[in-house]
Curated annotation (Swiss-Prot):
Mediates magnesium influx to the cytosol. The active site is at D379. Residues 1-21 are annotated as: Disordered. It is found in: Cell inner membrane. It is an enzyme of class 7 (translocase). Induction: Part of the mgtC/mgtB operon. Induced by low extracellular levels of Mg(2+). Mg(2+) binds at E337, D650, D654, N718, N743, D747. One of its GO terms (molecular function) is ATPase-coupled monoatomic cation transmembrane transporter activity. The gene is mgtB. It comes from Salmonella typhimurium (strain LT2 / SGSC1412 / ATCC 700720). Belongs to the cation transport ATPase (P-type) (TC 3.A.3) family. Type IIIB subfamily. Residues 102-113, 315-323, 725-733, 800-808, 861-875 are extracellular. Disulfide bonds: none annotated. This is Magnesium-transporting ATPase, P-type 1.
């Protein structure tokens, strides 16, 4: 540590110190404006690297070269989280009250104690929490197993004492420290934020950061073949990505090689800072907000109804202890304690179904958010497009397809000795099978001038083996090629490049640009054939004859257009949020069927207030030249407008948006930070799986909402029945233990709901949580069952003479069976808006589970358990009345269902 100067400490102060400052300054940014020697001095390093001792000491100071990432909590924490639910808290409180009233107080008075109620409530708690834990634990474990464990290394220089004996070593990138000198070559990931010391034909792909599909050239100094001053420094107004003498962590080398010094590692890099900012507490998704609102609606309802039941029974019966126990049982009955388990089971089932389509669901609630999603925002490069440049046209200056232009382009690309860029590779792929073998053998490469950032051209000198003619073939950007051209070829004639012809050619290239194509010009010049060792210089790139043009495109994925159309048919609007330029973006969007009217750019977004942006995001479908924060701002504007928003992206620059979306979707080839920030990962490029995810999400939501509507309406009906019975009957219509057993059995019957199916009509549009709808459903549908509960009361009171305290067991047994059977039958009545069993049948698991529970319910009064809890066998004459009551209930419920749909326009 003693050998590290003060400047170095300032440069690489821990990220926590930088965070305290108002403006985020990255160490690498400052080094772009210093010479290589100044940077080495500030880092107290050397062109031959660090010694082993120096590297070891700095590793202790700065820590490992790792960025923040999420960790799956230990199993114990997951177990505790499974019980972290308001309904569980309510049940635990009720279990505590039951323990005091049924066990502790009687024990103190020397009376008989009873823990049955406590055990039943704790069974419900355990069943709900443990099943939820098991489902989520299995899903987390599967997601972790699918993460690739790749150990990446970097090549560094390690010098001996006295700056001698430097050797190259391969070390894990986690062990890199500021001051290390690293080597970069084609195919390498840039392992840290680095300042270039030396480079040759170095091209870096920054698409993962910027969304721009074309690589950019990087260089150690501004001196190059164009003759720039080596001390000239970059423009300070440039963005971090535009600085040519630095490379950022997470980008990759597409061609060339370089030597660079590490300036920042870990969380002090640009990439690390972004990773740190997105790891932590996630914003609440639409799913979370919906579950919370529904949960508190039901809890508020319970808090209102339970005191009413207590007061009515207490005053009418005079036994406040018994009334308290009964009110306690009613509270348990009103608590949908299986909601967390039903939710988890439904989500896990959806995740398993999606995994068969090679889709990994990392966060279970993303399944439901998928179904609720009504806006999908997507990046362009690598998601809608193939992230692979293709040659589309090879044309002469008149815009006519030309085999000569293709041949010249192929000779230029195939004759380059360095690593070829994406456009050269596209030309070579296109030329396979189109360039005759005789052509390949006929021309011999003699020399080349590599591409560089200033000239923006690449030239090769080839010799015709048949005639000995030598020809310079130059390929490059339109403006730079126009600067060195004096002629162009029109058919078989070579004519002067007049101002008129120049304008016509520029108009053609601009027209292709407007269609989203990248355009290069190809030109030639005949050179003197004398000399055995011909060489090229920049001076030779003059008086060129333009032969034609090449157009390139990163085409959309085959499934993109179909997927977007399918999403639109299912009520999901698609918006494109990209860092790429508007022209290229518009072309791709048109091809896949997205409206490109009035594209909004990042500059325009930045100038808007939140209110203005909230209005504009509803009108526009395409947003270009966006920064990561601008993408997030657009997402948040859509969410504030009430939309459930998904985001599909694969780059580092997409990570914040992926994290803030209600459902973040990425692909397997995405950056690690993008995959970590996402909720769902597509393992294959077929985007049609998005439609399947939407349908599966709606099916999952439907089965969850079934449970809530059934439970809420059924419980409300029961409470209404209890209030009526309590007001007119001199004894409790059902004991607390009866209600607890009934509720437990009903809960068990609900366990099969995740395996039920939804009607096709339900799946046609996005579905969202709405506590008001559930409350309305409860108030309208719940009392329907009360009609037949009251009918049963009258039946037991008048027909079977269970109208006094001595006959209360018979009365309670009759309502126990009718209540359980009607509550279980309601599963089939309410699961569909159609006629149950005829137009829409439940799945086999639901039929078996509900049938079994109904059979057990009928048997209980005849069993030893029934005798233990105060029930008694019913006469056979009761059952024809029961069948008639249940059939009447089905008919009335179906009629009420039709009225409700006509009145409110929907069922769920």
């Amino acid at each position: 540590m003693t050998d590290m100067n003060i400047e170095n400490r300032k440069l690489n102060r821990p990220a926590s110190e930088n965070d305290k400052q108002h403006k985020k300054v990255f160490p690498i940014e400052a080094e772009a404006f210093h010479s290589p020697e100044e940077t080495l001095a500030r880092l107290n390093s050397h062109r031959q690297g660090l010694t082993i001792e120096e590297a070891s000491e700095r590793l202790k100071v700065y820590g490992r070269n790792e960025v923040a990432h999420e960790q799956v909590p230990p199993a114990l924490i997951q177990l505790l989280q499974a019980f972290n639910n308001p309904f569980i808290y309510v049940l635990m409180a009720l279990a505590g009250v039951s323990f005091i009233t049924d066990y502790w107080l009687p024990l103190r008075r020397g009376e008989e104690t009873d823990l049955t109620g406590v055990l039943i409530i704790l069974t419900m708690v355990s069943l709900s929490g443990l099943l939820r834990f098991w489902q989520e634990f299995r899903t987390n474990r599967a997601a972790q197993a699918l993460k690739k464990m790749v150990r990446t290394t970097a090549t560094v220089l390690r010098r001996g004492p006295g700056n001698i004996g430097a050797v190259q070593e391969e070390i894990p990138i986690e062990e890199l420290v500021p001051g290390d000198v690293v080597f970069l070559a084609a195919g390498d990931l840039v392992p840290a934020d680095v300042r270039l010391l030396a480079s040759r034909d170095l091209f870096i792909s920054q698409s993962i950061l910027s969304g721009e599909s074309l690589p950019v050239e990087k260089y150690d100094v501004m001196a190059d073949v164009a003759g720039k001053d080596s001390e000239q420094l970059p423009d300070k107004d440039k963005s971090l990505l535009d600085l040519g003498n630095i490379c950022l962590m997470g980008t990759n080398v597409t061609s060339g090689r370089a030597q660079a010094v590490v300036v920042a590692t870990g969380s002090r890099t640009w990439f690390g800072s972004l990773a740190k900012s997105i790891v932590g507490t996630r914003t609440q998704t639409a799913f979370d907000r919906g579950v919370n609102s529904v949960s508190w609606l039901l809890i508020r309802f319970m808090l209102i109804m339970v005191p009413v039941v207590l007061l009515i029974n207490g005053f009418s019966k005079g036994d406040w202890v018994e009334a308290s126990l009964f009110a306690l049982a009613v509270a348990v009955g009103l608590t949908p304690e299986m909601l967390p388990m039903i939710v988890s089971s439904n989500l896990a089932k959806g995740a398993i179904a999606m995994s068969r389509r090679k889709v990994i669901v990392k966060r279970l609630n993303a399944i439901q958010n998928f179904g609720a999603m009504d806006v999908l925002c997507t990046d362009k490069t690598g998601t809608l497009t193939q992230d692979n440049i293709f040659l589309e046209h090879h044309l002469d200056v008149s815009g006519v397809k030309s085999s000569r232009v293709l041949m010249l382009a192929w000779l230029n690309s195939s004759s380059q000795s360095g690593a070829r860029n994406v456009m050269d590779r596209a030309i070579l792929r296109f030329g396979e099978g189109r360039i005759a073998p005789s052509t390949k053998a006929r021309f011999i490469k003699r020399d080349e001038l590599p591409f560089d950032f200033v000239r923006r051209r690449v030239s090769v000198l080839v010799e015709d083996a048949q005639h000995g003619d030598r020809c310079l073939i130059c390929k490059g950007a339109v403006e730079e090629m126009m600067m060195v051209a004096t002629h162009l070829r029109e058919g078989d004639r070579v004519v002067a490049l007049t101002e008129t012809r120049r304008e016509l050619l520029l108009a053609k290239t601009e027209d292709y640009n407007a269609q989203g194509f990248r355009v290069l010009l190809i030109a030639t010049r005949k050179l003197d054939g004398s000399g055995n060792n011909p060489t090229l210089s920049v001076e030779d790139e003059t008086e060129l004859t333009i032969e034609g043009m090449l157009t390139f495109l990163d085409p959309p994925k085959e499934s993109a257009g179909k997927a977007i159309a399918a999403l639109r048919d299912n009520g999901v609007a698609v918006k494109v949020l990209t860092g790429d330029n508007p022209v290229v973006t518009a072309r791709i969007c048109l091809e896949v069927g997205i409206d490109t009217h009035d594209i909004l750019t990042g500059t325009q977004v930045e100038a808007m207030s939140d209110a203005e942006l909230a209005s504009e995001v509803e009108k526009r479908a395409v947003f270009a030249r966006l920064t990561p924060l601008q993408k997030t701002r657009i997402l948040q504007a859509l969410q504030k407008n009430g939309h459930t928003v998904g985001f599909l992206g694969d780059g580092i620059n997409d990570a914040p948006a992926l994290r803030d979306a209600d459902v973040g979707i990425s692909v397997d080839s995405a950056a690690d930070i993008a995959k970590e920030s996402s909720d769902i990962i597509l393992l294959e490029k077929d985007l049609m799986v998005l439609e399947e995810g939407v349908i599966k999400g709606r099916e999952t939501f439907g089965n969850i909402i079934k449970y809530l509507n059934m439970t809420a309406s059924s419980n409300f009906g029961n409470v209404f029945s209890v209030l009526v019975a309590s007001a007119f009957i001199p004894f409790l219509p059902m004991l607390a233990i009866h209600l607890l057993i009934q509720n437990l059995m009903y809960d068990i019957s609900q366990l099969s709901l995740p395996w039920d199916k939804m009607d096709k009509e339900f799946l046609r549009k996005p579905r969202k949580w709405d506590a008001k709808n559930i409350g309305r459903f409860m108030l309208w549908i719940g009392p329907t069952s009360s009609i037949f509960d009251i009918t049963t009361f009258a039946l037991m009171w008048y027909v079977f003479a269970a109208n006094n305290v001595e006959a209360q067991a018979l009365f309670q047994s009759g309502w126990f069976i009718e209540g359980l059977l009607s509550q279980t039958l309601v599963v089939h009545m309410l699961r569909t808006q159609k006629i149950p069993f005829i137009q829409s049948r439940a799945t086999l698991p639901v039929l078996l589970t509900t049938g079994l529970i109904m059979a057990i319910g009928i048997y209980i009064p005849f069993s030893p358990l029934g005798a233990m809890v105060g029930l008694e066998p019913l006469p056979l004459s009761y059952f024809p009345w029961l069948v008639a009551t249940l059939l009447s209930y089905c008919l009335v419920a179906q009629g009420m269902k039709r009225f409700y749909i006509k009145r409110f326009g929907q069922w769920f």
